[in-house]
Amino acid sequence: MSDERYQSRYGRYDSGRGGRSGYYSNYQNSSHHRSNDGPNTNTHGPSNGNGNSGGYYHGYYNRHGSMNGRAASSGRGYYGGHNTHITSAPHNNPNAYSRAPATGNTSYTGSYYSRGGNSSGRGGYSSYNRGGYHASHQYNNGGYYHRNNNYNSSYTERQKSVSGDSATSGGMKYTSSHRTTHVTHPAHPPITIQRSGSNGNGVAQGNASSGEVPTAPRRETTAQNNGRDKREEQLKKYGISNMAQGYLEIMDQNSSSTTSVTQTEIELDEKLREMNSQVFRTMCELALVENQYTRDTLNVQLTQEKLDTLLLS
């Protein structure tokens, strides 16, 4: 392959550029991480690390399967701008991930860039502690897994050894730890319950220590008293002393009232029918009178014509 070039998703294979052969890669961040003064072009080969390349990382895979290069940007949000050794592998070579990555502020596993303000961490997260959370990303035989290495959260419950009553000596304490933060929460103070006095409704209660029986509180309310007084007034109004008898008598009175109303309705219906009949008779009489009037008018006209005929003859 003298001058053959292959383009793939991992970069471009170029065997005729400057005597180097291997995979070239150009890692480009999203548009909101690129600087305005950097180039927006695909530059092959490692960068010198001195210019503002606008958020690119330029590197290449050598023949031995590792990526060597230099960060093109020294600002935050990318690799630290120092000489960086990336432990990665060329295409279709999963065995290259078996070598453990180097440690230090400039050693990264994989091609993930740091998003934090300090690029001295490992993997995709920087050493900047966002709420006490760190993550380490490593390759495992061509795969990718996630490991939480610096996050610790525990919640323990300890029984405090005390002598005497535990309610008066503090009882149980709860401890929680999150990284270096250690907080001890004291137990709640004991609650004392009084068993003598008033129940809140003005009714005196008995003393449990002396064996007195507490007085049962009254459950009557003002609305209940008003309703009962109203019923008693109604019964007195009708002269009724027994509740059941009062209900029966009230029902009888209501029935009598209903019967009276029904009878009155029947009588009114009969009177209405009589009035309708009388109106109909009156209308018929008026029709007869009108017919008689028409007949009399015709008779008068006929008589007048006869008189005119006699006078002309």
Swiss-Prot record:
Keyword tags: Activator, Chromatin regulator, Coiled coil, Nucleus, Transcription, Transcription regulation
Compositional bias annotation for Low complexity: 38-50, 144-155
One Gene Ontology term from the biological process aspect of the record: chromatin organization
Keyword Nucleus assigned: yes
Feature: compositional bias, Basic and acidic residues: 1-17, 217-233
Location within or outside the cell: Nucleus
GO CC annotations, alphabetized: nucleus
Biased composition (Polar residues): 84-96, 161-178, 193-212
The keyword Coiled coil belongs to this UniProt entry's keyword annotation: yes
Ranges for region Disordered: 1-56, 83-102, 144-233
Functional description taken from the UniProt entry: Involved in transcriptional activation. Also required for ubiquitination of histone H2B to form H2BK123ub1. H2BK123ub1 gives a specific tag for epigenetic transcriptional activation, telomeric silencing, and is also a prerequisite for H3K4me and H3K79me formation. Its precise role in H2BK123ub1 formation however is unclear.
Name of the protein this chain belongs to: Transcriptional regulatory protein LGE1
Organism of provenance: Candida glabrata (strain ATCC 2001 / BCRC 20586 / JCM 3761 / NBRC 0622 / NRRL Y-65 / CBS 138) (Yeast)
Protein's gene: LGE1
